[in-house]
Amino acid sequence: MALGKRKVVQQPLFVTVADLNVRSHPFYDAVNKVLDAHHFDVFVEGLCAGFYDDGTRGGRPGLAPGIYFRCLMVGYFEGIDSERGIDWRCNDGNALKLFLGLPVDKPAPGHSTISRTRRPIDLETHAQVFRFILKVLANHSLVEGKTAGVDSTTLEANAAMRSIVRRDTGEGYQQFLERLAKESGIETPTREDLAKLDRRRKNKASNDDWRSPDGPDAKITKMKDGTTHLAHKAEHAVDLGEGGHGAILAVSVCDAAAGDTATLVDTVVAATENLAALADDERVSDKVSGRWMSEAVLGKGYHSRQTLPDLEEMSVRSYASEPQRGRQRWDGQADARQAAYANRRRVRGERGKRLLRSRGEKLERTSAHCYETGGMRRLYLRGRENVAKRVLVHAAGFNVGLLMRVRYGLRKPRSLPAAAAAARALIFALVEWLRSIVAAARATGPVASPRQLPDRCNPALPAA
């Protein structure tokens, strides 16, 4: 066989679709079957009709809402963080064009088209789409709703720390350090002098003194890895019930500088509203617990004298891990004391311990799928509302993946080759195990059959 060489080939001017050998992806085919069975496109088109022109003025038609929301779901399934990345990925594979409902000879929507479609569609509409996917899960008996776990995580904003400016004077951080150096007697400070001066300062990056002109909603925050960035905070409410499978009941994007106790009530209210919408829908009302959102499982950051009584007023029983605070005084705070002691009794019981273990398992898994493998730990959108729109559809994609895992054993399209590799490894291990058994049998010699045994050792033969 002669050596083949790579040559510069002129592409053909015309090619038929039959020659492209287009193949769909089985995972995305399954997702489309579920969405089509519940009339997803009809729902979102009716929901978004008010944000589009009626067509009387002519012009190019806008991007279909069903395609727009599917593009954002592709961001979750493929682990893509930016709209430019979604644009590139959808145009790279014909299988994704089929998932979006586009002909293979037409380009997928570009990043500017996705951005232009996102801006007029308000946040409440994105929340309605998230609620629709939650109803799909409830229709498949994957939502219980009685017990919810709440946790938060930080998302790095699309703004650099070097761009922050003073709230009072508007000067940048470098200019601020140079002014401090001159006030301390250094006329021409070097970079080493500025770094030394910066290390000696205390409270050098306070949200009360500094802001980002690129992202006013982003706040200076210490991330989980110990670094400091401008960030937003995402808070999840996840189904932890006995019959639940860890579906996201609500998600909100909050001020990163606000403590967990300040944002908990809003997330609980959002989860309650979503579950109330399920209870009001006669198609799924019998598949959701009648005592929806009656228990909240929380971490140590949510335990406070104000939070626990607030939850009791909302008829929500708390299972909050209690931090070590030593001996406490409860002068004039009888309600807070009663709520704290009741929470302590529940946490120390068997059910409380089981729920806290379930919280550590399902909540951590949710954050990992949405923000680590889902590619949303670093944001490329500016403005808290735009971030919340993307996070809501991202969480809806997580719930769709949960349904796929329960029905087909695959949460994401990348799970398909992983499952095939696991099956091949299992078959290989079984073959090796059988080979070892055969080799051991050959080493010990043939096993005597009952006819080959002496008469006295063979009870099956009659005595002589």
Name every feature range the model reports, one short phrase each.
Residues 79-91, 102-464:
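Anion-binding and metal-coordination hotspots
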